[in-house]
Curated annotation (Swiss-Prot):
InterPro entries: A/G_cyclase, A/G_cyclase_CS, H-NOX_domain_sf, Heme_NO-bd, HNOB_dom_associated, HNOB_dom_associated_sf, NO_sig/Golgi_transp_ligand-bd, Nucleotide_cyclase. Disulfide bonds: none annotated. PANTHER family: GUANYLATE CYCLASE SOLUBLE SUBUNIT BETA-2, SOLUBLE GUANYLATE CYCLASE 88E. Expressed in embryos in a segmental pattern in the ventral nerve cord (VNC) and in the brain, beginning at stage 15 or 16 and continuing through to stage 1. Colocalized with Gyc-89Db in several peripheral neurons that innervate trachea, basiconical sensilla and the sensory cones in the posterior segments of the embryo. Expression in wandering third instar larvae is most prominent in a small cluster of cells located in the anterior medial region of each brain lobe. In the VNC, expression is found in scattered cells both laterally and at the midline. PROSITE patterns: GUANYLATE_CYCLASE_1 (PS00452), GUANYLATE_CYCLASE_2 (PS50125). It comes from Drosophila melanogaster. SUPFAM superfamilies: Ligand-binding domain in the NO signalling and Golgi transport, Nucleotide cyclase. The lineage of its organism: Eukaryota, Metazoa, Ecdysozoa, Arthropoda, Hexapoda. GO terms for cellular component: guanylate cyclase complex, soluble. One of its GO terms (molecular function) is protein homodimerization activity. Keywords: cGMP biosynthesis, Coiled coil, Cytoplasm, GTP-binding, Heme, Iron, Lyase, Magnesium, Manganese, Metal-binding, Nucleotide-binding. Its EC number is 4.6.1.2. This is Soluble guanylate cyclase 88E.
Amino acid sequence: MYGLLLENLSEYIKSVYGEEKWEDIRRQAGIDSPSFSVHQVYPENLLQKLAKKAQQVLGVSERDFMDQMGVYFVGFVGQYGYDRVLSVLGRHMRDFLNGLDNLHEYLKFSYPRMRAPSFICENETKQGLTLHYRSKRRGFVYYTMGQIREVARYFYHKEMHIELVREEILFDTVHVTFQLTFDNRAFTLASLAMTREEKHLPISAHVLFEIFPFCMVFGADMVVRSIGNSLMVILPELLGKKITAWFDLVRPLIAFKFQTILNRTNNIFELVTVDPVTERFDVQNEDLLQHEDGSEPEKSLRLKGQMVYMENWRMIMFLGTPVMPDLTSLITTGLYINDLSMHDFSRDLMLAGTQQSVELKLALDQEQQKSKKLEESMRLLDEEMRRTDELLYQMIPKQVADRLRRGENPIDTCEMFDSVSILFSDIVTFTEICSRITPMEVVSMLNAMYSIFDKLTERNSVYKVETIGDAYMVVAGAPDKDANHAERVCDMALDMVDAITDLKDPSTGQHLRIRVGVHSGAVVAGIVGLKMPRYCLFGDTVNTASRMESTSIAMKVHISESTKVLIGPNYKIIERGEIDVKGKGTMGTYWLEERENRLPLQLTAALQVHPLSPVPPTPTPKTKAIMPPVSKPLTPMMPVSVSLAASMPTSNVPAVDVMASSSSISGLALTAAAAAHMSLHHQAVVAEALTGASVEVALPSVASGATGAAAGGGAPSDDRNSRIYSPVTFKDVARRSVANSPVRSCAQPDQERRRESRSNSTGHVFMRTPSEIFGSLILDTEEFLEDLQISRSSLANNNNNQSPCGFSPTPPFRIGSAPPKPRPSNPDKFTPEELAAMDQLTPPSTAPARETASCSSASLDRDKATKLKKITFSNSSSLDATTPTALAAVVCPMRTKSPPMAVAPVMHMVQASTSKGDGQRPGSKDSVSSISLHSPPPHRSNSAPARPHSMSKAARKAFLAAKQTKAMEKLDKMIEEVQEVESQSVAKAANMRLALYGHDGGGDLAAGGCPLFLPPPPQQQQQQQQSLMPSSISDSGLCSHGHSHAPSCHHMDPKMTNSQSFQHSPRGGITHQCCSGFGHGNGRHSHRMHSNACRIL
């Protein structure tokens, strides 16, 4: 069955009963497609299925429904141009009825798989005729009656009465007899024309059979007497045989008998051979027997024509022509073009049809593709309409939205509800929370809370009215009236209080707190506004419910007297007493505590809600200690104080003496070997004591209780396995968001490229990149040495600046008598010679590894003069990094029972690597020396190189690496010059002492003598000096200098002394006898190089 009939049914229902009825019928019948394609084939029983369902839904009888659908069909086919075909089918109504079979034959060209019915007229009079209807389909009797009656009225302007005379079923064919009564005066005119005399012209049989090459002549016994020329070629055995044995009568649907054929001479007859004719011919090329689509053609010969009674012969002549859809059928039957008759268009139609078949096939394919696209578009449209309806129903109640769709005025949707229950809730201290967090965190928090509450509205069957800020409003009893509206709202309130405990306050870590108020009463509800319409509630009940919420307290459900009366006795209620309500006076209210046997919130994955992260997660730098790897999984980050309290008692924490740079330095670096001797808690205590900030460390899982306490911000976390929501915290959101940093400072705003320093909520400061820290340290060191060289060079060979101390040698840091190198105006820019030689520099990866110390940019001083007074460059003696005891002695020289914060006097934290050989001099490229920056640390130099914006990323990396390599090479060169000059100075001083003292005066080291041939200081002076040594970190005026040298003796070649140092105390004290401001310290002589250093520093 083609979709033309199904589309007729669909359009009839839509036009008469409406679109909604058709959609209802289609859904009940289980039909997914909203429309049908006219040329597509559908199941045979589909129309009957839809018709029966429509009769049930519409409440009409089968006869009325099918008859009216047939009447509608005549106007419906006019949309596709078939009304013109119907109008020219016959001059009179009787001609139309006699030509109905021919109409279906024409339509077969457009609908090749059509199973057309057969119509035969008989007993014709001027008052009407008898019509026989035969069809393979059942259930179309009344449908046919409506079509014929409408054709008579529409095209021939005649009123027709149709009577069903008989209906019978013969095998699979339905045979129905109609008696048609109408004005049939055209039949009288036709009878008069048949009675006129006709002159018979003689014609020979040879000419007749040549004009009709496929004709057949048979008598009353159905034996073939003669056949046409072309038929003689392909069926020569047919002559003299019964036609019923060789052919079947396909149309009309009557018995293949002589008398029956005489009564149906006005119809087109179609005969088909019983046996295939291709078996009689040997076709060599089998490819010619295939259609273009690969299917096999029909092998039987099909003839269509007219039956003419030859009165002189008393026989019937069948004037037929072969039905050939294409050339393939012609080849299959063994025929040729010249076998077709010349006087008609058989040959032209065959050739023209072949030429147009490709175009028609292409057009058909395009039409089918468009039809499929249209169906897909209709399906997508239905899906979008469904989603639109869902969105609309979330904003407006379904019953109200349907009324608006039907065109009702929005004001007409307002309705009075005698009793409803309204709930209001809001967050306690919401304004304060918003002031402590970012706007994105506020949005994320509200989204998480509202998502949970929206799920609870579905659980308790209440309607969400609106949300304003942190306020949430729901109602029960409207728009759907419900007798248990108070209980539903109370259950919603209890669920909201329970569910809010799973949401955390981002600013404090505690769970959010809400207050809830409920009141019951009468309201008016409806749609307000034309743009962005909303379903609103009006009445005093709304105001009272809002007052119940505003007078409630945190985590409590406050209900009124009217709500208490409506709920059952299974609710636990505590009387609050009378309170003053604004605008209401004194009211008696109650606390709703719990409901007996209330179902707990179940944990389901579909209802879990997670906050919206405002920014992509980025790692936030933390102040941390270098620790050995921990094999066990780590718990979430927690403050040190919380972790210590949760995991170990305070009395068990030993005091640790740690050497650090300053309290202003934000990080503590320990070597891996030394860190192995310290527990995680010890390192946390050390880091917290030195930085003054809460250092977060990862601790192994100690106990479930401790872990829960730490994760909950100190409060014990209750394991809510029965909840529908997993706990939601915003700690990670705040930690990952760079935009959430409350501090964002820029050091030196006048620089081309500002060094930005950010700190998170815990106060941890971090630089932009590690390479900048390293580059800053190298540039600061280089600048310091250049300043030192310029200052010392100005004192070289100057007799007026000689030290007044006769025991002090020549300043060891003097570079020589060479003139000082002029300092460039911008030391960070390469000279043209340096830029030309940059291509010859060694790649950065080949430079020797050097260890650097970093410090916070916020604590650096900008003044270079102050820097010269506060910075001391020291080379300390090398330590064996592989010996744990040696490192432990450096890091933790003593362990006492003093509290952790009582740190020993601050010392220089030195980290040095073991030199490759004993004979190597310190400071060479093979040995690495660490640089300690002491309190107060120097500010990063203003001469930091600006980022060359015109360079690519790779070029900038190469530029910075070349700069750092150049600085390291200059540092090595300067150290070598210093060592060389100092060696010369030591040799000169040794010769002078040898000339003065000879071998007496203290050169014996074994006897306790001074290696510099100097007498020891007075005992009293030494004791007083030791008593004035600073003992805590508060003695910040300490300034210390030192160099690592090999042992020396005046008898040997001049070498640097083992460990020479001096301390400078601004407060004065017991000093050396030769110079004010210098004294002995730690039992060592510290006057060797103070005289010239005093002038410099």
